[in-house]
Amino acid sequence: MKKILIIGIGAGDPDYVTMQAVNALNQVDVFFMMDKGPSKTKLIELRKEICRRYIKGDDHRFVDATSPQWTRGTEDYFSTVDDLNRDKQVLFERLIAEEMADGECGAFLVWGDPTLYDSTIRIIEIIASSGRHDLDYEVIPGISSIQALAAKHRTTLNRI
């Protein structure tokens, strides 16, 4: 069986990475890095810096892949997002099939908390339930930008 970890890595500051995320990072054999184009190259660099900072040893590898893109401002937003997520599903499924051996652990590193505004959980859930792969997955929560911002301003979320 292959295992996927969807790891929340905080709101852009490596100090926001939780101990649960650090423990998860150290279980991973292959990290899938989604390249979203030249304007977002620093996001991949920061993900790799987080790995360098927190992973003990070098028993892991990085697989870079070009992430499907969407065109903002289209008339049918929901259809566009559905198409984008289908394209991501095809890519993720190919990566899992071709880049992971049975018994390996792969990971997607998600900014903030993966349960907020991110399609990765939904896409991996579809792949896992399809029956085409012997796959399990786990979600590791992270510090969201909302939490970090509230803390920085010394307030509570219920006061915003």
Located regions from the model:
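N-terminal beta-loop-helix "entrance" segment that forms/cooperates
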Residues: 39-51, 72-76, 147-151
